Amino acid sequence: EIASCLVGSEMCIRDRNIAVEAALQHVWGYAVGLDMTRRDLQMKMREAGRPWELGKAFDQSAPIGPLHRAADVAGIHQAGIWLQVNGKDKQRSDIGKLIWSVAETIAYLSRYFRLEAGDLIYTGTPEGVGPVVRGDTMVGGVEGLGTLSVRID
């Protein structure tokens, strides 16, 4: 899954219950990221009635590109977002069409987690999520943030 990522600023330190209207003041910057899922582990844990975080939290599950300061990135909240697998489009949309805005995501998460400077938050993803296998190459990007290329080994 392609995602835009945001990085908490110093203003985030120990903040909880952040209002949507104030949420973007807590963002230091943005990056391109891939939010990977091991469906085999996820389903195995789910079938066993266990928490399935192992399907999301495995080695190299969240590659991320270079960080860009929020002040240096214009129009990120309407930017194009896309992912190709082996040169074929799999996901293509813009961030403004995602279910939750960046500000809504921060506000929601701050109800349950103490957000701190340096925290990485992977946002939502457009439709088109699908499997990848060894040897596949994923190239994704967010307009204004560049691209990220990952080969599955």
What is each of the regions a protein language model found here?
Residues 1-9, 13:
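Single conserved hydrophobic/aromatic residue that forms the stacking wall/gate
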Residues 39-153:
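Catalytic-pocket segment enriched in acidic/His residues
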Residues 1-2, 20-21, 111, 128:
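Short, flexible, glycine/charge-rich loop motifs used to bind or transfer phosphoryl groups or to couple energy/partner
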Residues 10, 14-31, 40-43:
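Extended, compositionally biased flexible segments
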Residues 6-8, 27, 78:
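A structure-centric signal for secondary-structure junctions around beta-strands
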Residues 5, 24, 112-115:
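Alpha-helix termination/capping residues and helix-transition junctions
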